[in-house]
Amino acid sequence: MESAITGRSRSTVSQLSRIVSGGHTGVDRAALDAALAAGIEIGGWCPRDRRSEDGIIPARYPLRETASRSYAVRTEWNVRDSDATLILVLDRISSGTRLTVDSAKSQGQPLRIEYLCENSKPGLLTEELSLEHRVAEVGDWIRREQIQTLNVAGPRGSSRKDVYLKSLEFLSMLFAEISVVPGRRTVKKAKHKYTPRGQD
């Protein structure tokens, strides 16, 4: 269930300090790349041997390996070790992304699903929202929930060739938007030191 957006002032500075992702192609890597560019700490769990559909997850992403090669394990652990999960999809939720949705719900974690393609969000019968407006809404959600560690997930790169670029654009705008301090625009450097919430 998506969190509702309140009228919280965007002058409130977000405490977001860490982006977590599984390192897969597509949305996962867009999240890591956008965070790196914004000076936000990154991390998360990935399958054993840094497994990914394009081979091995590049070493520039400091992810920790689970004991399993299963994608499901790292999905559950990334949800567990985050304050909330943001899912980006183009026009539909795939079976792999559905696992993240189910994991967040079963763990009682805040969850938001953001549709990146126009006319794809269920129940959107009124005027289409601009990209800037949708980015601002997600930024308000992050502030209201006081999210420090955000898990970002979504479809892999092979699902559609534009999923990485669309996700990178959205997240780059988001990380810039939540770093706004009244009177100036700067990128907030991460100060949060990550400590896992336990290993199974």
Regions found by a protein language model. Name each.
Residues 1-15, 188-200:
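Basic/polar N-terminal segments that are highly enriched at the extreme N-terminus
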Residues 159-162, 166-196, 200:
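Charged phosphate-binding loop/patch that engages nucleotide di/tri-phosphates or the phosphate backbone
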Residues 5-7, 12-149, 156, 163-178:
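Acidic/glycine-enriched connector segments
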